[in-house]
Amino acid sequence: MNIPVLGGVQVNASGNLSVSDIFYPVNGSLVTLFDKNVSAAEALGNLRSKNMLGVDTRINIVGFGAFRKDHKTFWSFDLNVRMEAEANMPYSLFDFLKNGRNEAVINDIKASTQAYLEAAFSYSFPLTDQIYLGARGKFLVGAARARTSIDRLDIKLQENSWNIDADGSFEMSGLEMSSMQRPDGSEYYSFDDFDVLPNKGPAGYGFAVDLGVTYDVIPDLQLSFAVNDLGFISWGKKYLERGQMTKSQSFTGVEIIDGEVHDPEFDFGELEFDRVQASKGKTEMLRTSINLGAEYEVWRHKIGLGLLYNVRVWDVKTFHNLTASVNFHPIPWFTLTTSYSFLNGQGHALGVAINACPSWINFFLATDMLICSHTPQFLPVTSTSMNVTLGIGVPIGRRSHRIPGEYLYR
C-alpha cells in the first residue's frame, strides 16, 4: 500500500535546452540570454534550429495492490495526477528577439500543456515458467489543456508600425478565457490582456493501456519489452475555446525620432486570434513511450548488468535514449543501481537509484542529477535532461515468489 502522495512522485524534463543555454551569470546574478550584458554571439551560439523542452509529472494519490495465493500473480489499483508540457522554439525566434531585427520569417512555434486524472488497474501473471505478462488499463479524466501553434510568422517594421502576416491557432479546454471585442462586433483573443478561469467539471475523457512482458531466456538473462501510455483523451466541445490567426495585422506605437526608429521592441502579446466557434471536440493521443531492456545476472545473482533502450514520442519529435546500468543487490531487500545514459545523441547523464524494501517499508529513489552541477532550486545547469522518481509504500504479507530462491542466493 502506497503512502498517499508520497507513494509515487515522478518528474521528468528533457529536450535539447539546458539552464545554461537560457540563463547567464552577470555581476553575481543570473540574467536571461536577452539581457543586454549577454552578447548575441554568446546567447545564440548554443541554440539549435529547433529548441525543444518538455516536462511531465506524475503524482500518485492512492495506490494499493496484492499478490494472489500463488504469490506470482499480482493486481493493483492506483489513482494519479498527470501533468505534461512541451514547447518548440525555432532559432529564428531567438535571433529576432536578441538582435532586434526589423524583419523576420519565423516558422513552427509550438507550445502545449495538459493535466488529467488517471485511474489505473493493473494485472500481471506468469504465462509460462519463462514468460511473465502485465497489462494496465487506465481511465482518464481531462482537467485542462492548452495548445498554441504558429506555423508562419512574417514580421516587418514599417515607418511607424509593425506589419504581421501570420498563420496560427490556439485551443484551450477546461479553461474559460476572456475574449475582446472589436468595433465591428467580432471577438478575438489577445495574450496581452486576458483572464483565465477554470471550468466546473471534467473537460474530457479517455482511455489508455500499458503493456509489458519479460522473458527469461536462461536463468541469468532476462529480456523485457513495454509500451506505456498507448491511448487518447477526447476533449469535449462544451469547454473548448478556439482562436485562429490567418490574416495580416498591424501594430502602431513604434517611436521615431529624427527619422530614426528607437526601441522597436515587438510585443508578441499583441497578436490577435479571431475567436472561432468550436463545432466539435478534439481527440488527442497521449505521449507514448517504448522500453526495450535486457539484464544479465552475475555472481550468484547479486550483480545485474542492464541495458535499456527508451523511445518517447512527442508532438514535435521522437526522442531516443540508451541507458547502461549496474545493479547491486547483495541482500534480498536492498538494491543499489548506477547508470549512464546517452540522451538522444546530444548529451549524457549519470544516474543513481536505491530501493530498500525490508518487511516494514518499501522505499525507492532514483535520479540522474545527483552529481551534476545544479542551481539552488536543484535544476541541472548543463544537462538537457532531469529525472527524479521517489516513492514510499508499506508492505503487507509475504514476499513474491516470482524469482525462485535457488536463483537468487545460491
Language model feature labels by segment:
Residues M1-R410:
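Subset of outer-membrane beta-barrel
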